[in-house]
Amino acid sequence: MPGMSRHNQSVGAYGERCALRHLITAGLRPVARNWRCPHGEIDIIAWDGPVLAICEVKTRRTDTFGTPTAAVTGTKARRLRLLAARWLAETGTRADEVRFDVLSIRLTGGPPHVEHLKGAF
């Protein structure tokens, strides 16, 4: 990830692993992680029953720069919609319903706190 320090990349990767464990425990079936194309990246793609969940993971150690969920701006939401359409087209996957979720991971000491906001946008 250009522009990110190695430490921030490590924190982000740890947060994504926490999010993945949370999703699996909640019964979702992951089908892709860190899917990339020239226009961006989708953190996690998973089936929640018949619904395809496009998951953005935001990890924070403090709220100094805002909450993890607040980091998903309108611009980011629009980009994720475009990326999801591209992933569906490239993989030939059919989904009657696509949902956009945000997983907020807070690392403030002790076990990670995971908040899963389904249908965030």
From Swiss-Prot:
Disulfide bonds: none
Spans traversing the lipid bilayer: none
Coiled coil: none
Name of protein: UPF0102 protein Strop_1320
SUPFAM superfamilies: Restriction endonuclease-like (SSF52980)
GO molecular function: nucleic acid binding
Family membership noted in the UniProt record: Belongs to the UPF0102 family.
HAMAP family associated with the record: UPF0102 (MF_00048)
Pfam family, one: UPF0102
InterPro entries membership: Restrct_endonuc-II-like, tRNA_endonuc-like_dom_sf, UPF0102_YraN-like
